Amino acid sequence: MASLGLQLVGYILGLLGLLGTLVAMLLPSWKTSSYVGASIVTAVGFSKGLWMECATHSTGITQCDIYSTLLGLPADIQAAQAMMVTSSAISSLACIISVVGMRCTVFCQESRAKDRVAVAGGVFFILGGLLGFIPVAWNLHGILRDFYSPLVPDSMKFEIGEALYLGIISSLFSLIAGIILCFSCSSQRNRSNYYDAYQAQPLATRSSPRPGQPPKVKSEFNSYSLTGYV
C-alpha cells in the first residue's frame, strides 16, 4: 500500500508539473520591465515571453503581439522554445506511460513488466523536468546578469517574471515525481524479492535427514512417556 500511495503522489506531482510547464511556456511574462534609475517614470511597461511580447500602458490597457518571425529571435529564446516544447511532449508521454505502470490501474495487471513501465514513466518525468529547468535557469541567469551590469542602460533592464517562477516550480515537481515513481517501484521489487526468499526458506529446511542419522519416529516427538500411564 505504501508503494501505491507513493505512485499516486508522484503521478499527481508529475501532472501538476506538466500543466505548470505548459502555462509557463505560453505566458508572455518571462521578463518584465524594471523600474530603476531613469526608467522609474515611464508610460509603458513591457513584458516578454517565448512567443509574444506585451506592452502595458499607464491607462491600464495591455496590448500583446505575437512574434512575426521565429528565426529572427535571439538564440536563447529559440533554444528555450525548443526545450520547453520538448519538455511538454516528454512529460505528456510520461503521464501516459505512468498510468499503464501504476498499480491502481487495470492495465497489464498480470504482467511482471508493470513496475518497469512505471519506472520508465518516472525516467521520462525526470527528463522532462530537466529539459524544462534548463531554459528557465538560463533566462533567469541572463536577466540577473543584465540587471546588475553597469554597461546595460536602465531602460534595457528587466526583472524576473512570474512565468519563470512557475517554470522552476513545475520543473521541480516533474523531477520529484520521477524520483518518487522510480523509488516506489524499486522498493516494491526489493520487498517482493524478500518475501519470495522468506517463503522459500521453510521449504529448504524440510530436507532429508543427514547421512548416518536415523529418521525420527513419531513417538520421539512426544515429550510424554507412554509407559507412565500403564
From Swiss-Prot:
Stretches with biased composition (Polar residues): 220-230
- DNA repair among the record's keywords? no
Q: Enumerate the transmembrane spans.
A: 8-28, 82-102, 117-137, 163-183
Location of the protein in the cell: Cell junction, Tight junction; Cell membrane
Question: Which keywords describe this protein according to UniProt?
Answer: Cell junction, Cell membrane, Disease variant, Disulfide bond, Isopeptide bond, Membrane, Phosphoprotein, Tight junction, Transmembrane, Transmembrane helix, Ubl conjugation
Pfam families on file: PMP22_Claudin (PF00822)
The disulfide bonds in this chain are 54-64
Q: Does the keyword Transmembrane helix apply?
A: yes
Q: Which residues carry this modification: Phosphoserine?
A: 219, 223
Q: What does the entry list under GO cellular component?
A: bicellular tight junction; cell junction; cell-cell junction; intracellular membrane-bounded organelle; nucleoplasm; plasma membrane; tight junction
Q: Which residues lie on this side of the membrane: Extracellular?
A: 29-81, 138-162
Membrane topology of this protein: Multi-pass membrane protein
Modified how: The disulfide bond is necessary for pore formation, but is not required for correct protein trafficking.
Top-rank taxon: Eukaryota
Q: Per its database record, what is this protein's job?
A: Forms paracellular channels: polymerizes in tight junction strands with cation- and water-selective channels through the strands, conveying epithelial permeability in a process known as paracellular tight junction permeability. In intestinal epithelium, allows for sodium and water fluxes from the peritoneal side to the lumen of the intestine to regulate nutrient absorption and clear enteric pathogens as part of mucosal immune response. In kidney, allows passive sodium and calcium reabsorption across proximal tubules from the lumen back to the bloodstream.
**How does it associate, per the subunit comment?**
Can form homo- and heteropolymers with other claudins to mediate paracellular barrier and channel functions of tight junctions in response to physiological stimuli. Homopolymers interact with CLDN3, but not CLDN1, homopolymers. Directly interacts with TJP1/ZO-1, TJP2/ZO-2 and TJP3/ZO-3.
Associated clinical condition: Azoospermia, obstructive, with nephrolithiasis: An X-linked recessive, male infertility disorder characterized by epidydimal obstruction, hypercalciuria and kidney stones.
Q: Which family does it belong to?
A: Belongs to the claudin family.
Protein name stated in the entry: Claudin-2
Organism, per UniProt?
Answer: Homo sapiens
